[in-house]
Protein backbone atom coordinates (compact mmCIF):
# COMPACT_ATOMS: atom_id res chain seq x y z
CA UNK A 1 0.00 0.00 0.00
CA UNK A 2 1.31 3.47 -0.85
CA UNK A 3 2.31 6.02 1.81
CA UNK A 4 -0.60 8.30 0.94
CA UNK A 5 -3.38 5.79 1.24
CA UNK A 6 -3.94 5.65 5.05
CA UNK A 7 -3.43 9.36 5.37
CA UNK A 8 -5.82 10.05 2.53
CA UNK A 9 -8.31 7.62 4.02
CA UNK A 10 -8.11 9.36 7.38
CA UNK A 11 -8.39 12.74 5.73
CA UNK A 12 -11.27 11.54 3.61
CA UNK A 13 -13.08 10.68 6.81
CA UNK A 14 -11.86 13.44 9.12
CA UNK A 15 -10.43 16.03 6.75
CA UNK A 16 -13.63 18.05 6.53
CA UNK A 17 -14.15 17.91 10.29
CA UNK A 18 -12.37 21.21 11.14
CA UNK A 19 -14.34 23.11 8.55
CA UNK A 20 -17.54 21.36 9.65
CA UNK A 21 -16.71 22.14 13.26
CA UNK A 22 -16.07 25.74 12.31
CA UNK A 23 -19.27 25.89 10.31
CA UNK A 24 -21.19 24.35 13.18
CA UNK A 25 -19.64 26.83 15.61
CA UNK A 26 -20.50 29.69 13.28
CA UNK A 27 -23.99 28.25 12.92
CA UNK A 28 -24.41 28.07 16.70
CA UNK A 29 -23.19 31.65 17.01
CA UNK A 30 -25.55 32.59 14.22
CA UNK A 31 -28.40 30.93 16.13
CA UNK A 32 -27.46 32.91 19.21
CA UNK A 33 -27.44 36.11 17.18
CA UNK A 34 -30.84 35.22 15.68
CA UNK A 35 -32.16 34.57 19.20
CA UNK A 36 -30.82 37.95 20.32
CA UNK A 37 -32.29 39.49 17.19
CA UNK A 38 -35.69 37.94 17.96
CA UNK A 39 -35.39 39.15 21.54
CA UNK A 40 -34.78 42.67 20.29
CA UNK A 41 -37.67 42.19 17.85
CA UNK A 42 -39.94 41.24 20.74
CA UNK A 43 -38.69 44.28 22.62
CA UNK A 44 -39.62 46.40 19.61
CA UNK A 45 -43.03 44.72 19.56
CA UNK A 46 -43.43 45.60 23.23
CA UNK A 47 -42.08 49.12 22.61
CA UNK A 48 -38.82 48.55 24.54
CA UNK A 49 -36.13 48.97 21.92
CA UNK A 50 -35.07 49.06 18.29
CA UNK A 51 -32.60 47.11 16.19
CA UNK A 52 -30.04 49.16 14.35
CA UNK A 53 -29.23 48.69 10.71
CA UNK A 54 -25.65 47.88 11.74
CA UNK A 55 -26.74 44.66 13.53
CA UNK A 56 -28.84 43.70 10.53
CA UNK A 57 -25.88 44.14 8.18
CA UNK A 58 -23.73 42.03 10.54
CA UNK A 59 -26.28 39.22 10.41
CA UNK A 60 -26.37 39.36 6.63
CA UNK A 61 -22.56 39.19 6.54
CA UNK A 62 -22.69 36.13 8.83
CA UNK A 63 -25.15 34.47 6.48
CA UNK A 64 -22.92 35.15 3.49
CA UNK A 65 -19.89 33.73 5.35
CA UNK A 66 -21.84 30.59 6.26
CA UNK A 67 -23.01 30.20 2.67
CA UNK A 68 -19.44 30.50 1.36
CA UNK A 69 -18.16 28.06 3.97
CA UNK A 70 -20.93 25.59 3.18
CA UNK A 71 -20.11 25.71 -0.53
CA UNK A 72 -16.43 25.26 0.31
CA UNK A 73 -17.20 22.22 2.50
CA UNK A 74 -19.40 20.71 -0.20
CA UNK A 75 -16.65 21.14 -2.78
CA UNK A 76 -14.07 19.71 -0.38
CA UNK A 77 -16.32 16.76 0.38
CA UNK A 78 -16.80 16.06 -3.32
CA UNK A 79 -13.03 16.08 -3.79
CA UNK A 80 -12.63 13.65 -0.90
CA UNK A 81 -15.28 11.37 -2.38
CA UNK A 82 -13.36 11.33 -5.65
CA UNK A 83 -10.14 10.55 -3.75
CA UNK A 84 -11.87 7.75 -1.85
CA UNK A 85 -13.20 6.26 -5.05
CA UNK A 86 -9.76 6.45 -6.59
CA UNK A 87 -8.15 4.79 -3.56
CA UNK A 88 -10.87 2.19 -3.54
CA UNK A 89 -10.17 1.32 -7.16
CA UNK A 90 -6.44 1.33 -6.43
CA UNK A 91 -6.87 -1.03 -3.47
CA UNK A 92 -9.10 -3.33 -5.46
CA UNK A 93 -6.51 -3.49 -8.21
CA UNK A 94 -3.58 -4.13 -5.82
CA UNK A 95 -5.07 -6.04 -2.93
CA UNK A 96 -7.75 -8.64 -2.62
CA UNK A 97 -8.00 -8.31 1.13
CA UNK A 98 -11.64 -8.28 2.17
CA UNK A 99 -10.87 -6.59 5.49
CA UNK A 100 -9.41 -3.53 3.83
CA UNK A 101 -12.36 -3.34 1.49
CA UNK A 102 -14.72 -3.61 4.43
CA UNK A 103 -12.83 -0.84 6.19
CA UNK A 104 -13.01 1.25 3.07
CA UNK A 105 -16.75 0.58 2.79
CA UNK A 106 -17.21 1.61 6.41
CA UNK A 107 -15.24 4.76 5.80
CA UNK A 108 -17.32 5.45 2.72
CA UNK A 109 -20.53 5.00 4.71
CA UNK A 110 -19.23 7.30 7.41
CA UNK A 111 -18.35 9.87 4.77
CA UNK A 112 -21.87 9.56 3.42
CA UNK A 113 -23.24 10.10 6.93
CA UNK A 114 -21.00 13.12 7.27
CA UNK A 115 -22.26 14.41 3.92
CA UNK A 116 -25.86 13.90 5.05
CA UNK A 117 -25.09 15.78 8.24
CA UNK A 118 -23.53 18.57 6.22
CA UNK A 119 -26.59 18.66 3.98
CA UNK A 120 -28.83 18.85 7.04
CA UNK A 121 -26.70 21.72 8.32
CA UNK A 122 -26.99 23.46 4.96
CA UNK A 123 -30.76 22.97 5.01
CA UNK A 124 -30.89 24.33 8.52
CA UNK A 125 -28.83 27.30 7.34
CA UNK A 126 -31.32 27.89 4.53
CA UNK A 127 -34.21 27.66 6.98
CA UNK A 128 -32.51 30.12 9.29
CA UNK A 129 -31.86 32.41 6.34
CA UNK A 130 -35.54 32.28 5.40
CA UNK A 131 -36.51 32.93 9.01
CA UNK A 132 -34.12 35.88 9.10
CA UNK A 133 -35.57 37.32 5.89
CA UNK A 134 -39.10 36.89 7.25
CA UNK A 135 -38.02 38.44 10.55
CA UNK A 136 -36.35 41.32 8.71
CA UNK A 137 -39.50 41.86 6.66
CA UNK A 138 -41.61 41.79 9.79
CA UNK A 139 -39.21 44.18 11.50
CA UNK A 140 -39.46 46.62 8.60
CA UNK A 141 -43.25 46.42 8.76
CA UNK A 142 -43.17 47.03 12.51
CA UNK A 143 -40.79 49.97 12.09
CA UNK A 144 -43.06 51.48 9.43
CA UNK A 145 -46.08 51.11 11.69
CA UNK A 146 -44.28 52.13 14.90
CA UNK A 147 -44.67 55.87 14.21
CA UNK A 148 -48.46 55.59 13.74
CA UNK A 149 -49.21 52.89 16.30
CA UNK A 150 -51.42 53.99 19.25
CA UNK A 151 -52.76 52.35 22.36
CA UNK A 152 -56.00 50.46 21.72
CA UNK A 153 -57.99 47.65 23.22
CA UNK A 154 -56.35 44.95 21.10
CA UNK A 155 -52.77 45.99 21.98
CA UNK A 156 -52.48 43.94 25.24
CA UNK A 157 -53.75 40.75 23.55
CA UNK A 158 -51.42 41.22 20.56
CA UNK A 159 -48.44 41.90 22.84
CA UNK A 160 -49.30 38.81 24.87
CA UNK A 161 -49.58 36.62 21.77
CA UNK A 162 -46.35 37.96 20.27
CA UNK A 163 -44.46 37.52 23.56
CA UNK A 164 -45.78 33.96 23.97
CA UNK A 165 -44.85 33.15 20.36
CA UNK A 166 -41.36 34.55 20.86
CA UNK A 167 -40.94 32.55 24.09
CA UNK A 168 -42.11 29.39 22.33
CA UNK A 169 -39.71 29.99 19.44
CA UNK A 170 -36.82 30.56 21.86
CA UNK A 171 -37.67 27.35 23.71
CA UNK A 172 -37.75 25.45 20.42
CA UNK A 173 -34.39 26.94 19.42
CA UNK A 174 -32.95 26.03 22.81
CA UNK A 175 -34.20 22.44 22.49
CA UNK A 176 -32.81 22.26 18.97
CA UNK A 177 -29.42 23.52 20.16
CA UNK A 178 -29.37 20.95 22.98
CA UNK A 179 -30.26 18.16 20.55
CA UNK A 180 -27.53 19.27 18.17
CA UNK A 181 -25.00 19.35 21.02
CA UNK A 182 -26.07 15.87 22.08
CA UNK A 183 -25.66 14.63 18.51
CA UNK A 184 -22.21 16.16 18.33
CA UNK A 185 -21.26 14.47 21.62
CA UNK A 186 -22.39 11.09 20.30
CA UNK A 187 -20.57 11.80 17.06
CA UNK A 188 -17.36 12.68 18.93
CA UNK A 189 -17.62 9.48 20.99
CA UNK A 190 -18.08 7.46 17.82
CA UNK A 191 -15.14 9.27 16.24
CA UNK A 192 -12.94 8.56 19.26
CA UNK A 193 -13.93 4.89 19.19
CA UNK A 194 -13.21 4.79 15.49
CA UNK A 195 -9.77 6.35 16.04
CA UNK A 196 -9.01 3.76 18.71
CA UNK A 197 -10.10 0.95 16.40
CA UNK A 198 -8.05 2.46 13.60
CA UNK A 199 -4.98 2.59 15.85
CA UNK A 200 -5.55 -1.05 16.81
CA UNK A 201 -5.75 -1.97 13.15
CA UNK A 202 -2.56 0.01 12.46
CA UNK A 203 -0.76 -1.87 15.25
CA UNK A 204 -2.06 -5.13 13.82
CA UNK A 205 -0.72 -4.14 10.40
CA UNK A 206 2.64 -3.35 12.02
CA UNK A 207 2.69 -6.80 13.61
CA UNK A 208 1.83 -8.38 10.30
CA UNK A 209 4.60 -6.37 8.67
CA UNK A 210 7.08 -7.47 11.33
CA UNK A 211 5.93 -11.08 10.91
CA UNK A 212 6.33 -10.74 7.19
CA UNK A 213 9.80 -9.23 7.71
CA UNK A 214 10.74 -12.11 10.07
CA UNK A 215 9.49 -14.74 7.66
CA UNK A 216 11.30 -13.06 4.78
CA UNK A 217 14.73 -14.81 5.37
CA UNK A 218 13.03 -18.20 5.45
CA UNK A 219 11.24 -17.48 2.23
CA UNK A 220 14.49 -16.27 0.74
CA UNK A 221 16.12 -19.61 1.63
CA UNK A 222 13.30 -21.51 0.04
CA UNK A 223 13.35 -19.58 -3.19
CA UNK A 224 15.64 -20.75 -5.95
CA UNK A 225 16.13 -17.48 -7.76
CA UNK A 226 18.43 -14.87 -6.19
CA UNK A 227 16.95 -12.11 -8.29
CA UNK A 228 13.47 -12.97 -7.15
CA UNK A 229 14.59 -12.98 -3.52
CA UNK A 230 16.24 -9.61 -3.92
CA UNK A 231 13.15 -8.19 -5.57
CA UNK A 232 10.90 -9.56 -2.84
CA UNK A 233 13.22 -8.17 -0.18
CA UNK A 234 13.18 -4.73 -1.74
CA UNK A 235 9.44 -4.97 -2.07
CA UNK A 236 8.91 -5.87 1.57
CA UNK A 237 11.45 -3.28 2.71
CA UNK A 238 9.63 -0.70 0.71
CA UNK A 239 6.32 -1.84 2.22
CA UNK A 240 7.85 -1.71 5.70
CA UNK A 241 9.11 1.82 5.19
CA UNK A 242 5.75 2.86 3.82
CA UNK A 243 3.98 1.24 6.78
CA UNK A 244 6.28 3.05 9.21
CA UNK A 245 5.66 6.32 7.43
CA UNK A 246 1.94 5.67 7.43
CA UNK A 247 2.12 4.82 11.12
CA UNK A 248 3.86 8.10 11.84
CA UNK A 249 1.33 9.94 9.74
CA UNK A 250 -1.51 8.18 11.55
CA UNK A 251 0.01 9.09 14.91
CA UNK A 252 0.22 12.71 13.84
CA UNK A 253 -3.36 12.48 12.61
CA UNK A 254 -4.46 11.01 15.94
CA UNK A 255 -2.66 13.82 17.76
CA UNK A 256 -4.34 16.37 15.53
CA UNK A 257 -7.69 14.69 16.06
CA UNK A 258 -7.19 14.75 19.82
CA UNK A 259 -6.38 18.44 19.61
CA UNK A 260 -9.52 18.94 17.56
CA UNK A 261 -11.46 16.93 20.12
CA UNK A 262 -10.15 19.17 22.89
CA UNK A 263 -11.03 22.20 20.80
CA UNK A 264 -14.49 20.82 20.21
CA UNK A 265 -14.93 20.14 23.93
CA UNK A 266 -13.90 23.70 24.64
CA UNK A 267 -16.38 24.91 22.06
CA UNK A 268 -19.00 22.61 23.55
CA UNK A 269 -18.39 24.18 26.94
CA UNK A 270 -18.74 27.60 25.35
CA UNK A 271 -21.96 26.43 23.71
CA UNK A 272 -23.18 25.17 27.08
CA UNK A 273 -22.34 28.56 28.53
CA UNK A 274 -24.23 30.24 25.72
CA UNK A 275 -27.16 27.91 26.42
CA UNK A 276 -27.07 28.92 30.07
CA UNK A 277 -26.94 32.55 29.02
CA UNK A 278 -29.90 31.92 26.75
CA UNK A 279 -31.74 30.31 29.64
CA UNK A 280 -31.02 33.32 31.81
CA UNK A 281 -32.08 35.61 29.00
CA UNK A 282 -35.23 33.55 28.52
CA UNK A 283 -36.03 33.72 32.23
CA UNK A 284 -35.43 37.47 32.26
CA UNK A 285 -37.55 37.77 29.14
CA UNK A 286 -40.31 35.78 30.84
CA UNK A 287 -40.12 38.03 33.88
CA UNK A 288 -40.23 41.08 31.65
CA UNK A 289 -43.18 39.60 29.75
CA UNK A 290 -45.00 38.84 33.01
CA UNK A 291 -44.33 42.38 34.21
CA UNK A 292 -45.46 43.73 30.86
CA UNK A 293 -48.62 41.61 31.04
CA UNK A 294 -49.32 42.93 34.53
CA UNK A 295 -48.83 46.46 33.24
CA UNK A 296 -51.15 45.68 30.34
CA UNK A 297 -53.68 44.30 32.81
CA UNK A 298 -53.48 47.47 34.90
CA UNK A 299 -53.79 49.53 31.75
CA UNK A 300 -56.81 47.48 30.65
CA UNK A 301 -58.46 47.96 34.03
CA UNK A 302 -57.70 51.65 33.90
CA UNK A 303 -59.10 51.86 30.37
CA UNK A 304 -62.24 50.00 31.49
CA UNK A 305 -62.61 52.36 34.44
CA UNK A 306 -62.15 55.36 32.19
CA UNK A 307 -64.72 53.95 29.80
CA UNK A 308 -67.22 53.50 32.61
CA UNK A 309 -66.57 57.05 33.75
CA UNK A 310 -66.91 58.18 30.16
CA UNK A 311 -70.26 56.39 29.86
CA UNK A 312 -71.43 58.05 33.11
CA UNK A 313 -70.26 61.43 31.84
CA UNK A 314 -71.98 60.76 28.53
CA UNK A 315 -75.23 60.05 30.40
CA UNK A 316 -74.88 63.25 32.38
CA UNK A 317 -74.01 65.11 29.22
CA UNK A 318 -77.13 63.71 27.55
CA UNK A 319 -79.25 64.84 30.50
CA UNK A 320 -77.67 68.28 30.41
CA UNK A 321 -78.24 68.40 26.67
CA UNK A 322 -81.91 67.55 27.13
CA UNK A 323 -82.21 70.19 29.85
CA UNK A 324 -80.46 72.71 27.63
CA UNK A 325 -82.84 71.83 24.80
CA UNK A 326 -85.81 72.31 27.10
CA UNK A 327 -84.42 75.62 28.33
CA UNK A 328 -83.73 76.62 24.75
CA UNK A 329 -87.31 75.82 23.77
CA UNK A 330 -88.56 77.84 26.74
CA UNK A 331 -86.26 80.69 25.76
CA UNK A 332 -87.62 80.52 22.23
CA UNK A 333 -91.19 80.59 23.54
CA UNK A 334 -90.35 83.52 25.79
CA UNK A 335 -88.61 85.22 22.90
CA UNK A 336 -91.66 84.71 20.69
CA UNK A 337 -93.93 86.01 23.44
CA UNK A 338 -91.57 88.94 23.93
CA UNK A 339 -91.70 89.67 20.21
CA UNK A 340 -95.49 89.48 20.31
CA UNK A 341 -95.53 91.71 23.37
CA UNK A 342 -93.23 94.17 21.63
CA UNK A 343 -95.49 94.07 18.60
CA UNK A 344 -98.51 94.67 20.84
CA UNK A 345 -96.70 97.50 22.55
CA UNK A 346 -95.78 98.98 19.20
CA UNK A 347 -99.40 98.63 18.07
CA UNK A 348 -100.61 100.17 21.33
CA UNK A 349 -98.10 102.98 20.95
CA UNK A 350 -99.25 103.46 17.37
CA UNK A 351 -102.86 103.46 18.49
CA UNK A 352 -102.01 105.89 21.27
CA UNK A 353 -100.31 108.14 18.74
CA UNK A 354 -103.32 107.79 16.48
CA UNK A 355 -105.63 108.57 19.40
CA UNK A 356 -103.52 111.56 20.28
CA UNK A 357 -103.64 112.66 16.66
CA UNK A 358 -107.40 112.10 16.59
CA UNK A 359 -107.78 113.93 19.87
CA UNK A 360 -105.67 116.75 18.53
CA UNK A 361 -107.71 116.77 15.33
CA UNK A 362 -110.87 116.66 17.37
CA UNK A 363 -109.68 119.58 19.45
CA UNK A 364 -108.73 121.42 16.30
CA UNK A 365 -112.13 120.65 14.80
CA UNK A 366 -113.72 121.76 18.02
CA UNK A 367 -111.81 125.02 17.86
CA UNK A 368 -112.68 125.35 14.18
CA UNK A 369 -116.31 124.71 15.03
CA UNK A 370 -116.22 127.27 17.76
CA UNK A 371 -114.60 129.72 15.36
CA UNK A 372 -117.18 128.89 12.74
CA UNK A 373 -119.98 129.29 15.24
CA UNK A 374 -118.51 132.61 16.28
CA UNK A 375 -118.19 133.65 12.66
CA UNK A 376 -121.73 132.42 12.03
CA UNK A 377 -122.91 134.41 14.98
CA UNK A 378 -121.13 137.48 13.65
CA UNK A 379 -122.55 136.91 10.17
CA UNK A 380 -126.04 136.42 11.53
CA UNK A 381 -125.67 139.55 13.60
CA UNK A 382 -124.54 141.52 10.57
CA UNK A 383 -127.33 139.93 8.56
CA UNK A 384 -129.86 141.13 11.09
CA UNK A 385 -128.36 144.58 10.92
CA UNK A 386 -128.51 144.45 7.12
CA UNK A 387 -132.11 143.30 7.24
CA UNK A 388 -132.99 146.11 9.58
CA UNK A 389 -131.24 148.59 7.37
CA UNK A 390 -132.99 147.21 4.27
CA UNK A 391 -136.28 147.46 6.05
CA UNK A 392 -135.53 151.03 7.06
CA UNK A 393 -134.43 151.88 3.50
CA UNK A 394 -137.54 150.41 1.99
CA UNK A 395 -139.68 152.31 4.38
CA UNK A 396 -137.82 155.52 3.63
CA UNK A 397 -138.14 154.85 -0.07
CA UNK A 398 -141.79 154.44 0.19
CA UNK A 399 -142.08 157.54 2.26
CA UNK A 400 -140.01 160.06 0.38
CA UNK A 401 -140.29 158.82 -3.17
CA UNK A 402 -137.83 158.51 -5.90
CA UNK A 403 -136.27 161.99 -5.47
CA UNK A 404 -134.94 161.33 -2.07
CA UNK A 405 -133.56 157.96 -2.77
CA UNK A 406 -130.48 159.28 -4.59
CA UNK A 407 -128.99 161.04 -1.54
CA UNK A 408 -128.66 158.15 0.90
CA UNK A 409 -127.23 155.82 -1.71
CA UNK A 410 -123.73 157.25 -1.48
CA UNK A 411 -123.93 157.11 2.28
CA UNK A 412 -125.34 153.65 2.41
CA UNK A 413 -123.32 152.26 -0.51
CA UNK A 414 -121.30 149.78 1.46
CA UNK A 415 -124.19 148.27 3.38
CA UNK A 416 -126.19 148.10 0.19
CA UNK A 417 -123.44 146.19 -1.53
CA UNK A 418 -123.23 143.89 1.46
CA UNK A 419 -126.98 143.39 1.30
CA UNK A 420 -126.75 142.71 -2.39
CA UNK A 421 -123.94 140.27 -1.79
CA UNK A 422 -125.76 138.45 0.96
CA UNK A 423 -129.30 138.86 -0.23
CA UNK A 424 -129.25 136.06 -2.83
CA UNK A 425 -128.38 133.51 -0.14
CA UNK A 426 -129.85 132.86 3.21
CA UNK A 427 -127.71 132.38 6.37
CA UNK A 428 -128.50 128.66 6.34
CA UNK A 429 -127.16 128.39 2.83
CA UNK A 430 -123.96 130.19 3.85
CA UNK A 431 -123.53 127.79 6.79
CA UNK A 432 -124.12 124.81 4.54
CA UNK A 433 -121.42 126.03 2.16
CA UNK A 434 -118.68 125.70 4.91
CA UNK A 435 -117.33 122.11 4.87
CA UNK A 436 -115.55 120.08 7.56
CA UNK A 437 -113.53 116.92 6.67
CA UNK A 438 -112.37 113.79 8.59
CA UNK A 439 -108.68 113.96 9.60
CA UNK A 440 -108.07 110.26 8.71
CA UNK A 441 -110.03 109.48 5.55
CA UNK A 442 -110.66 113.14 4.47
CA UNK A 443 -114.42 112.70 4.07
CA UNK A 444 -116.12 116.16 3.92
CA UNK A 445 -119.25 117.02 5.85
CA UNK A 446 -121.22 120.33 5.90
CA UNK A 447 -120.85 122.41 9.01
CA UNK A 448 -124.49 121.78 9.92
CA UNK A 449 -123.76 118.02 10.06
CA UNK A 450 -120.98 118.31 12.59
CA UNK A 451 -122.57 115.66 14.83
CA UNK A 452 -122.46 113.11 12.01
CA UNK A 453 -118.82 114.05 11.52
CA UNK A 454 -118.04 113.28 15.19
CA UNK A 455 -119.73 109.89 14.92
CA UNK A 456 -117.75 109.16 11.73
CA UNK A 457 -114.45 110.16 13.38
CA UNK A 458 -115.06 107.83 16.33
CA UNK A 459 -115.87 104.95 13.96
CA UNK A 460 -112.92 105.71 11.66
CA UNK A 461 -110.36 105.78 14.50
CA UNK A 462 -111.27 102.30 15.76
Curated annotation (Swiss-Prot):
Keyword Secreted: no
Biased composition (Basic and acidic residues): 1-11
Pfam families on file: EABR (PF12180)
Region (Interaction with TSG101): 157-235
Sites of Phosphoserine modification: 96, 99, 423, 426, 434
GO molecular function per UniProt: identical protein binding
Keywords attached to this entry: Cell cycle, Cell division, Coiled coil, Cytoplasm, Cytoskeleton, Mitosis, Phosphoprotein
Gene3D superfamilies per record: Geminin coiled-coil domain (1.20.5.1180), Nemo cc2-lz domain - 1d5 darpin complex (1.20.5.990)
Domain of life: Eukaryota
Coiled coil: 50-185, 228-400
Region (Disordered): 1-25
PTM: There is a hierachy of phosphorylation, where both Ser-423 and Ser-426 are phosphorylated at the onset of mitosis, prior to Ser-434. Phosphorylation at Ser-423 and Ser-426 is required for dissociation from the centrosome at the G2/M boundary. Phosphorylation at the 3 sites, Ser-423, Ser-426 and Ser-434, is required for protein function at the final stages of cell division to complete cytokinesis successfully.
UniProt subunit comment: Homodimer. Interacts (phosphorylated on Ser-423 and Ser-426) with PLK1; the interaction is indirect via the MTMR3:MTMR4 heterooligomer, occurs during early mitosis, regulates the phosphorylation of CEP55 by PLK1 and its recruitment to the midbody where it can mediate cell abscission. Interacts with AKAP9/CG-NAP; the interaction occurs in interphase and is lost upon mitotic entry. Interacts with PCNT/Kendrin; the interaction occurs in interphase and is lost upon mitotic entry.
Protein's name according to its UniProt entry: Centrosomal protein of 55 kDa
Species annotation: Rattus norvegicus
Amino acid sequence: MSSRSPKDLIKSKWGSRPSSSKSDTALEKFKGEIAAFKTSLDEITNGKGKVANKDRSKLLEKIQVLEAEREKNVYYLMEKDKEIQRLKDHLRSRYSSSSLLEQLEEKTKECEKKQQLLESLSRETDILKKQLSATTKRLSELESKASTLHLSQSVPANCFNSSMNSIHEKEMQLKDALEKNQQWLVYDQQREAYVKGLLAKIFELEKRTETAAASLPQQMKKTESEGYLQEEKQKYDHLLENAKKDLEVERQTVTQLRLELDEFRRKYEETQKEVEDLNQLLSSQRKADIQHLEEDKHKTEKIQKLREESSVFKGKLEEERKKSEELLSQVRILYDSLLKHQEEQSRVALLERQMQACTLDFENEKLDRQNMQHQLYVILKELRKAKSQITQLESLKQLHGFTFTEQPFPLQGEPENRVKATSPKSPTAVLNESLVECPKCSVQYPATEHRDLLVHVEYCMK
